[in-house]
UniProtKB/Swiss-Prot annotation:
GO cellular component, one term: chromatin
Protein name: High mobility group-T protein
Residues in the DNA-binding region annotation: 8-78, 94-162
Keyword hit for Glycoprotein: no
Cellular localization per UniProt: Nucleus; Chromosome
Disordered: annotated segments: 162-204
Molecular function in Gene Ontology: double-stranded DNA binding
Keyword field: Chromosome, DNA-binding, Nucleus, Repeat
GO biological process, one term: regulation of transcription by RNA polymerase II
Composition bias type Acidic residues, residue spans: 181-204
UniProt keyword DNA-binding, yes or no: yes
Superkingdom per UniProt: Eukaryota
Organism encoding this protein: Oncorhynchus mykiss (Rainbow trout)
Amino acid sequence: MGKDPRKPRGKMSSYAYFVQTRREEHKKKHPEASVNFSEFSKKCSERWKTMSAKEKGKFEDLAKLDKVRYEREMRSYIPPKGEKKKRFKDPNAPKRPSSAFFIFCADFRPQVKGETPGLSIGDVAKKLGEKWNNLTAEDKVPYEKKASRLKEKYEKDITAYRNKGKVPVSMPAKAAAPAKDDDDDDDDDDDDEDDDDDDDEDDE
């Protein structure tokens, strides 16, 4: 199935806005020059790493605004028949817990980057994977225990989160049914009394 042209454009990250700005600047300076995408991406990545938080600020603001735009448009977007609507992620929902491997990565990523500066994200991940595979089962235990605790906490949090928005099923509607029958019985009794009165009048 082709892409739905009415589907909202995906949200852009602060880095994507930075790259877009750099590309536009490059086109203005060199309108006729062709761009080596790989080389251009590498330069953008290097420049982004050396930028201060203040320099990145305007791009982060643009990303925040675009996120608001995207979330607003996705709420009102109705996908074509046969295509499932992408489930909107509630930012307040509990985040899924990290696995033992990801907890290990968070601990050792700075070390790997420090040992080999300039590594790409992919190469860092590869080295972390190798380190993890070289660990003994005993060495992995602390990370697995932490992951287990995080999973238990997540399961409690997600249950509480799901129940928070639910309205409990009330019983009054069912309880009202017998009451209605009682009323009907009362009406029948009244009818019977009326009939008795009529009979008395006939006897007179």
